[in-house]
Amino acid sequence: MSLRFGATCLLSFSFLLLITSSDGRTGLGKGFGDHIHWRTLEDGKKEAAASGLPLMVIIHKSWCGACKALKPKFAESTEISELSHNFVMVNLEDEEEPRDEDFSPDGGYIPRILFLDPSGKVRPEIINESGNPSYKYFYVSAEQVVQGMKEAQVRLTGDAFREKHFQDEL
């Protein structure tokens, strides 16, 4: 009886330890949703160049309260999930953040969401229109992210983007 009780306690403790040590950050999703096809920045730039899709880049820190608050809203949004198929999705956490100042156009606050054209160039004109004007790339809700994704789609895909892009090269 005591051997059975000891085994049950050990099994229960192991299960409890497994549950409490998991923070939902498996894979490249890092809490933003493993159902989304995330890439590294390097792989994402290659894929965007080959596919012609724009990139959406999330920059966040594991210790950041605002980042932790955005994660479940982002991960649970079916609209973000659906729109993500029209982007190369890149998720950068902690030391993965690029040192290039293009990735912090108005400061190094977090989280930041930036949109890049298919050539890998940050497009600073795509901002959170309904957010704080001092923090243009800071999103606090799934609705704001969806709005940004839709704006990026309009500006970075299709004929409007190609016309503008080719004019810039001339």
UniProtKB/Swiss-Prot annotation:
The keyword Repressor does not apply. One of its GO terms (molecular function) is protein-disulfide reductase (glutathione) activity. Glycans are attached at residue 128. Coiled coil: none annotated. It comes from Rattus norvegicus (Rat). One of its GO terms (biological process) is negative regulation of endoplasmic reticulum stress-induced intrinsic apoptotic signaling pathway. It is an enzyme of class 1 (oxidoreductase). Its EC number is 1.8.4.2. Its main location: endoplasmic reticulum. This is Thioredoxin domain-containing protein 12. InterPro entries: AGR/TXD, ERp19, Thioredoxin-like_sf, Thioredoxin_CS, Thioredoxin_domain. Protein-disulfide reductase of the endoplasmic reticulum that promotes disulfide bond formation in client proteins through its thiol-disulfide oxidase activity. Pfam families: Thioredoxin_7 (PF13899).
